[in-house]
């Protein structure tokens, strides 16, 4: 039987959770999950022991999602961002897979009904991404202010709405769409690269042309996709050779565009050549 819990000054482990773990400490290896879950449980000394959410929808965002966020940031400091990309990709895959087996309903993160794949996998992705968009110091400042306000609170207890309001206060107007996409709705992307071309320049650098598509859509609690028709905020694209148009929720999004290479001496080692956010306003970009 797996066991993992936390008490004041104590984090008990069962053997299945950590003691028989085989950790690959190499640069190409994965993250030390025993270390990760230990950090998660220690983080509960703040998120669940000091900040106690009311027994309503979204309460596990305050405990589990924020403990996951703390774990990610500690892992990032110890292992670097390269390994974080592996962890985040796995979390995304687990979220997308798990939601296909939902038998009840999937709510937005701040109204989640206690499903693990939402408050763990999706929650960790959202808070980590938010720290990347608005800045880690900015997000942590909002979290610190929130903790000071509600720590050891007597009933009525705090809710996810209160936390999201604190985050709104520090989010710039240009990124307000993130609050709706990340917390208030179920928002997904259908992004893909259509074509790439590269040319070596005389100075030894490369010019890279990328044609890509960015499309954003929402899901209701039963998994039905819609593209903003309920709010009349959708956009479309249709080329001459397309039988049907493609749709997207109205775009004003900052999307990461990256180019990665392999180390000449170590083909398994990934090298970041370019990574920058670009503001996207339409579906197709060349």
Regions found by a protein language model. Name each.
Residues 176, 188-282:
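Beta-strand-rich binding/interaction modules
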Residues 284-286:
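Conserved small/polar residues in nucleotide/adenosyl-binding loops
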Residues 1-211, 219-221, 225:
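Hydrophobic alpha-helical and helix-loop surface patches within well-folded domains
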